Regions:
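Rossmann-fold cofactor-recognition segment
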Residues: 48-63
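Active-site loop immediately N-terminal to the catalytic Tyr-X3-Lys motif
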Residues: 95, 145-149
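C-terminal helical subdomain
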Residues: 178, 194-231
């Protein structure tokens, strides 16, 4: 399968992977709407290509979400691809489970997507060719590791939600895709104070995502493969061994 250029909407398109994917898609003839809270970031990205268009949005505002879906559909006639990449990355100190910190992470990372689903599904269901919903999770969502409680929990929630949606939305001609990258250079990863194996350039990650989206309909786009293998294998370990190895990572940081 080779997905023809159409209309894409990227949530979190003002920086990082979202911005890089917007440029990659626009370079291949797509019309790309990008959304995020910071208008200055969106305008900077949209100025880089005539096919990129800024739609400021607070993903925690359900009414604004519905209005933005309506606006994009009115401007372009359709939404062929939704890429959800909004992220609130919150580190959690070992043994600390602050409710406000967890709530903030879930409100953006998970509930932000949920607020989009009904209006986007309604729009895509009207389209003869349906559409695609792609969600950027993380390899961190495969297992729970120290200091990543809130972030990993949200990414794990996205993985299981996408698994559910893949089956439920197929009759509506909507293909759900899960994207699980490892460490990718961004403002968020720049804050990390620990070793990040196989840290990837943002543009490389964007190319892999776009290539996976347009060339196939497989469920998961995961990379880099050595990290994917390690993290998926970790899920198969006996808990006693897994917890012992997990404790080693806590001491090593």
């Amino acid at each position: 399968m080779n997905l023809k250029p159409g209309v894409a909407w990227i949530i979190g398109g003002g920086s990082g992977i979202g911005a890089a994917v917007a440029r990659e898609l626009a370079g291949h003839g797509w019309q790309v709407a990008i959304s995020g809270r910071r208008l200055d970031r969106l305008e900077e990205v949209s100025a880089s290509h005539s096919g990129i268009h800024a739609y400021p949005l607070d993903i925690t505002d359900a009414e604004a979400v519905a209005a933005t879906v309506t606006a994009i559909a009115a401007d372009f006639g359709r939404v062929d691809l939704l890429l959800y990449g909004a992220v609130a990355a919150t580190g959690t100190p070992p043994g600390s489970y602050d409710a406000a910190r967890f709530a903030a992470a879930f409100d953006v990372n998970v509930m932000g997507l949920v607020r989009l689903l009904d209006p986007v599904i309604t729009q895509m269901s009207r389209q003869p060719t349906g559409g695609q919903i792609a969600v950027i999770s993380s390899l961190a969502g495969y297992v729970g590791l120290p200091r990543g409680g809130a972030y990993a929990a949200t990414k794990s929630a996205l993985i299981t939600l996408c698994q559910t949606m893949r089956v439920e939305l197929e009759p509506k001609r909507i293909i759900v895709r899960l994207i699980t990258p490892g460490f990718v250079k961004s403002e968020l990863t720049a804050r990390n104070r620990y070793r990040m194996p196989m840290l990837m350039e943002t543009e490389d990650a964007a190319w892999r995502i776009v290539d996976g989206l347009v060339r196939s309909t497989r469920f998961e786009i995961a990379f880099p493969w050595p990290m994917v293998f390690v993290m998926k294998a970790a899920r198969l370990l006996p808990y006693r061994l897994f917890f012992w190895l997990s404790a080693l990572t806590l001491r090593a940081r």
